[in-house]
């Protein structure tokens, strides 16, 4: 007991004597409530808690709903920006899409006040994300949509001059308002270039799912104004030959991610030569494509052209045995085109009535650079064993395998 009592003050002294840098690192993992408690321990900890490095990143969730038992999330968000916004460099706002106009009105008011406060305190934002607004919902009236878009445009005109990463995924604008925002982005870059420029842009589901964006030439024109773009994420409905030509002008693109889903336009024709020119203009380019519920091999072949430098492919396909579709052509004919570039493969298939074991094994065998495989499908146990054997005995590049056979069986394998 005496030894234990001697250890307690010793441990306290050790904590109090830790260097400032170590304490900042430890405190960065604490939630706000624990940070408040830690700030009361001593003067040193109180001073460290005022360090800007602890308050540079923040994520808020806005719902627009009212609770009888606690304050709305946006109240604490606005208070945070008022007191600590001068340190804020990375801000993420995730929205729960409103079902009623009253909720949409509250959301609009909260986001407007948040951005007004960011402008007032001159927050040095480098990264901004506003996700899942879904302005095509009926809860958003015409005036509310216009007000929300105007709020974002106003922030781009009057807010931080240091932004290099912007995410507006899930916004679902009509074509007119979407183009207004894209124009504001290009004007933002024109104002501050070369002192500051946008290098990362996420516009997945930026336009409403019913819009044939690829028919509008203003989208490539605006994106071509972003001269140092290295990371771009779009919905497949935006893809066109004109867009690929616009992206090759500055030779900076390194990661190009495309998301395609059944309910959005995806039947446009894109020339393989356009992809080849882009790949030659941007030698470090890696293309990532995710496909959701497109169960038509002709459409998949039209999208997955051999000229694409595809490094990552994700697909979810839920189909009944009665449907006239099989993933076998995808596994045996289409994906082997990328044997020299494919690094990550993620497949979620409910192949109730057919075996895909041999096709999958052959695909893994021919893909020279495949590092990670994630698959949710009906596979035989011996297939998993053969996959592991490949990684151990055949000098395969495959280092990580995730297999889920059903809701009750999960297997993760890591190899060195």
Per-range role (PLM):
Residues 1-416:
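The conserved beta-strand core of Leucine-Rich Repeat
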